[in-house]
């Protein structure tokens, strides 16, 4: 049976939230990436938009875990997500773009659901697959803080690439997606899944990749996507950040 990249990204995406008073909350999305340390130790990395975490004033947010029951049911069980220690951010941000990453301790089922680092597009993926204006992409998130059901799964939405050119990435680090971006979408993955099925005996989906992170809404209600290569770069910065954080 073929594995669907869409389902795998739904399973790897989580809600991030923090109460903001008067019954309101700051809500966004993040997704988990399996990115082993340089010495080969397993590591689960949470990827999201930097502005989402910066908007949260308290040191602790909540992350929306989901757990499967033996009868096919699902249970939504949000848990604590420390994002600062005594006011100092625990996440690492890309120095130029709205991307944030942090190493987290995830439940075993979520550590298994984390997508491989290799699924993130690199600097040649768009050209290799001929991606351009009009191509359909998908994103998952929590628009206006809503989930697809009480189990806390994200909502899937689609849009088309709405800008040109999209490469070279060094000159065009973001691209536009024709989708109405609402509060709660920020930080979610944007991906190509037209050919995103994995054949038995192969490791990765064919012709599918995570194109970037949804990071901004324009006044035209068009989404701004930051290319995934900058997620890769931010993850590389994690090792230095972790060393500096040691007492």
Residue spans for each PLM region:
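Residue-level recognition of beta-strand microenvironments
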Residues: 33-35, 164, 193, 216
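Catalytic nucleophile loop of clan PA
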Residues: 176-213
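A conserved glycine-rich beta-strand in the N-terminal activation segment of trypsin-fold
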Residues: 19-45
């Amino acid at each position: 049976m073929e594995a669907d990249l869409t389902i795998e990204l739904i399973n790897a995406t989580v809600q991030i939230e923090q109460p903001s008073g008067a019954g309101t909350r700051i809500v966004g999305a993040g997704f988990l990436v399996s990115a082993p340390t340089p010495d080969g130790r397993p590591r689960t990395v949470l990827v999201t938009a930097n502005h989402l975490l910066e908007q949260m004033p308290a040191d602790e947010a909540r992350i929306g875990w989901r757990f499967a029951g033996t009868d096919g049911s699902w249970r939504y069980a949000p848990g604590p997500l420390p994002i600062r220690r005594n006011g100092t951010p625990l996440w690492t941000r890309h120095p130029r773009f709205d991307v944030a990453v942090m190493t987290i301790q995830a439940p075993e089922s979520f550590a298994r659901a984390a997508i491989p680092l290799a699924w993130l597009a690199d600097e040649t993926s768009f050209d290799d697959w001929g991606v351009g204006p009009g191509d359909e992409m998908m994103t998952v998130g929590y628009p206006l803080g809503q989930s697809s059901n009480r189990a806390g799964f994200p909502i899937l939405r689609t849009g088309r690439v709405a800008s040109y050119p999209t490469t070279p990435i060094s000159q065009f680090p973001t691209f536009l997606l024709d989708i109405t971006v609402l509060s709660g979408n920020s930080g979610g993955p944007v991906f190509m899944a037209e050919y995103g099925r994995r054949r038995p005996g192969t490791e990765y989906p064919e012709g599918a990749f995570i194109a970037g992170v949804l990071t901004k809404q324009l006044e035209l209600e068009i989404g701004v996507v930051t290319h995934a290569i900058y997620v890769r770069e931010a993850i590389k910065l994690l090792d230095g950040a972790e060393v500096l954080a040691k007492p």
